């Protein structure tokens, strides 16, 4: 989507008001910029500060003294007059300043926490948190208004002189000065949410009721445009400094008043001053290592017994290891309520971003206001149900009167005119052709009309290869909710040019709840019938992507064990808002071995293999699965639904029953599987993802119905799969697997000279598989030599030693060029097997902050 604006929008601007003084604050001796310099008029309680790059902007007041102060520098006061320029370069002289036996200077010196008054004060502030926590009340509630604006940032005024740009008055009218950074921006989307937030102490429960939602902007131009708002909301979440850890940019940041703050940050007392008539201690802080994921900023602490935060400013250190973020600024203000307590009422955030320096820059502005705090009893009926977030049925259909009453922050002129801007943009000459191409690239589908009833795709499955078909072509399509909001059809026709075979898939979906575009939108409540005839590798089922994806068609080993399958499946899926998903399936399937795979019963041992008939099996089964993941969030693409937030745990439990004699089923069997996934954050040491799985095949079955490892045969990294296990290499009827991955987030590299400038991130992993095959399913035992149920194992399939789990180790470097992840994989054991490959390199392209 960003490329769309690079192609269409030249950076645009308009002149700033002459009633503002702006400039930069620098060190007199070194010329370095001085971040977070206090900027205020004398005798004025309002405190401003320069940003992380030393830039400042403040209202012009002729005849008053403007004061600049920073830790370790001599305070400077300047009389503002008519001749004072609008652009200023302020130089501050370094000094050594003693604060109650603690020396603070601009030169690097040893920081001591012992006998440090700033540290002692912060210990008292942290200890006082529990006393002032609103959750001490039995009940409380408040209203919240939040506005999210996404815009092109830092537009160059010189480019307005371009003749083509001058002709686009509708575009020039959309440009405005951002009040937070005084740069010219071009707003592209705005999202508003009004909610009521409820809290009950006993039994503890919290609810967020979404009363109103309003979204307009470039996300309306593409059907999966909700991805933009969903990702922005998850990345730039609400910040509560009273939490020990603050989740931001999908990472945990140590709060400056969290339990670990004393060890993580360095604190300095700046001054004692008044903020809105309240006497406050003014402190500054920064991380011990500025490349760690932490904040730099200022705190204003009430100089009374509450020691509550009155105001805070948070930003990222200049040397931060965070990707794509040029500047982040958070300003929060707390207000005293009628009962004397303090509550958060203002929470503003701006994030200035760029993928690479020479490309278009962007800004996200999140404006939040909390109001109407109340502590009266809330009726129990308001807390019914397990869903934490409840949507008013009419939340997206609120009228202007609702927004006039609940919009506590006015829209800017550009935000108000967003609809007309998008309309003008969509009617620009050549725009439709560019949009068509970009949508096909971004969404992997081609729409067949402006309001598409049928989409063609996925595009990346149209051409692929495999061992049986050689070259394979495929044409796929799916209907959308524009045709029927409750009923969906999809399918494909494929041709294998070497095998001369034709393949198909047809799917009918009925959704009990109305959908906006695709049937898998949350919550999914559907009945689905699918009929498929195709060819596959047994390991294909472990891949989250389409098996015909051209990018995963390149394998590190020859995949010649394959089978044709003819499958009919009826499924019912029902998701609850609070995270529980129930799935019931009925399936009948016939598999015919092909390639180097044979389904040969032991009772036919010694018979000659007929290349035209390598064996078939048919199964009929019913399965039941429960999946629970509280707080999980998603984005919808045209191909599938993707997780956004990986912090919530995931629990799954399933059981499958095979029935002989029903719809031609040849076998009775019972398969039980369970899994747990959990992410653990280690503060500045990154995160550890742990996935544990286990399963049992309870009955005697032929090898196609045994449990095979989740083998990833491509060069592309896929989560929770084994990279060096071959196709069907191990066959078990009992197994347990453990997948542990540790993303150190640059903790070690950031402390190595030169390497730390690359901003690489370390990644370690270990994957273990324990498996066993009970005697009843072991075809190599003499007692099973003529068993009519069991089959000979394929060549290259082996039995594991139950006392020796398979282990592979992974060491990787992530964040290469902020995009490329490279992993080296080493197979620790079972290397004497003919199919074993000891080492491998896997890659992945993934953008992370």
Segments the model singles out, each with a brief description of its role:
Residues 21, 28-43:
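Short, ordered, surface-exposed loop/turn motifs in non-cytosolic proteins
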Residues 21-27, 54, 90:
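A short, amphipathic beta-strand motif
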Residues 26, 70-73, 85-134:
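Short, acidic, small-residue-rich periplasmic hinge/interaction motif at the N-terminus
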Residues 31-35, 57-64:
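Short Pro-Gly-centered beta-turn/loop motif in secreted/extracellular proteins
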Residues 41-43, 65-78:
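A short, solvent-exposed loop/turn motif at the edges and junctions
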Residues 45-55:
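Short, acidic Ser/Thr/Gly-rich low-complexity loop/linker segments typical of extracellular
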Residues 108-280, 286-294, 356-457, 461-464, ...:
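Structured extracytoplasmic
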Residues 251-253, 375, 385-849:
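Exposed, low-structure sequence patches enriched in small/polar residues
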